[in-house]
C-alpha cells in the first residue's frame, strides 16, 4: 500500500542477525537453527533487527537472517519469491491486502494450528478487525499483525478554538468542509485542510476510497459491475476534488502522506484526514504541534464509520521447511512481551502498536500516547473490511478492493483524479476513463463466474 505506515530509509540493506549480530549479504544459508526473513525497511522493523539477536536468538538459539528492502522493492521480491515457491525465505512482511490473495494461491501457510498450540501468544488479544483482515475466504488465519492502523481526522485544537469552532466527535464530511472554509488562512500560509492528491492506489485513493464508501459508492457491485461513473462515486470524487482545490494545501496533486504530515507539523494546514499512525510523529517530543492536535473519527456521510484498515504482518511461505521456527519468530515479534521490550529499551512511543487490545490498557504506553491512543483504538475496532459501505461487495477491503488487479487499476484511475485536482481535467472526464479501466477488470471476473 503506501506510505501510510512510516517508511525509513530509501536504501536497501541486507542484515544478518545471529547470536552476535553483523552485516552480511543475502539471506544466510544458515543451518538447522536459522530462518530467513524478508521484510520492509520501516522504522519498526529496523528496531526489530536491533533487538533480535540479544533476545529472540539468545532465548531460542534460532539465528535470524534478515533481508530488508524499501517497500516497492520488497513487494516485488516477495511476489517473485512466493509465486515461485522458491523456499528461500521462511517469513515475510505482507499486508492485509496481499495476505488473502496469497492464501488463495496457496503461497502462504495457515497459522491456526500454531496459534492453537501456543496459548501464550493469546490470539484473543489481537484486535478482531486485524484477525478478520488477515484471514482468507476459507476461514483460516494466514498472518499475524506486527503493527496496524486505521484513519481519522486530525485538527489544530487551538486554531479551531480561536475561530469559535467545536469539532464534533463524529463529524460529517460536510461539517469538515464547512470548518475548512472557516479556518482557511487562519494563520499565514495555513490551508483549511490537507488531503492526499498524489497519484497511487495507496496514495490519493487510500483516503478517497473511504470517502467513496461513505458517500454510498463502490468500485464494483457484488456481481462485478463497474461503478466508477456512478452518481455516488462521482459525488464523492467531486466533493474531494472541490474541497482540496478550494481549501486544501499548496501542491496538492503531488501531496502524499509525508507531505501532509509535514504540512500539519509546520503549521501549513489546520486539519488532515489520514492514517492513525501519523499521530506518533505529531506528538513526538520534538514536534512543534505536540499537544495542539485533536483526533476524531473519520468523517462520514451515509455510513456509521469510514476509517480504513491496514497492517504490516508476518506470513510463512508454504514452501518453507522451517515452519516451526518461523512461527516461533512470529510469535515473539508480535507478542505482548516484544512490545514491552521495545517500550523498556527504545521508548514506548516506538512500540509497534495498533494490533493488541492489551497495548491500550498499558499504563506505560498510555502515558506516551494518551492524546491519540483511544481514538486510534476506536478507529481500528470500527473498521469492517467485509462491510465498508452501503452495498455488498465482490471482494473485501475498505480503502482498496482485495483483488490482484487493484494496484494497477487504482493507480491508473488515481492519475486521472490527480489531474482533476490539478485542474487539468474534469472529474467527469477522469471517471469516464476510470469506468473503462474498471470495466475491463470487472468483465474478466464476470467471464470467470459463468
Question: Model-predicted segments: where are they?
Answer:
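Extracytoplasmic/periplasmic solute-binding protein
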Residues: 136-146, 151, 174-226, 238, ...
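Short, solvent-exposed loop/beta-turn-alpha elements that line the ligand-binding surface or hinge
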Residues: 112-126, 169, 193, 197-200, ...
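C-terminal lobe and pocket-closing loops
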Residues: 116, 278-289, 302-411, 449
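Hinge/lid segment of periplasmic solute-binding proteins
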Residues: 96-150, 204-207, 294-296, 380
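Short, low-complexity disordered leader/linker segments with a strong preference
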Residues: 1-36, 116, 428-432, 436-450
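Glycine-centered hinge/linker elements that transmit conformational signals in sensory
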Residues: 179-182, 222-254, 294, 298
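Conserved C-terminal helix/tail region of periplasmic/extracytoplasmic solute-binding proteins
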Residues: 161, 384-450
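Extracytoplasmic "Venus flytrap"/periplasmic binding protein-like
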Residues: 55-126, 161-164, 263, 267-271, ...
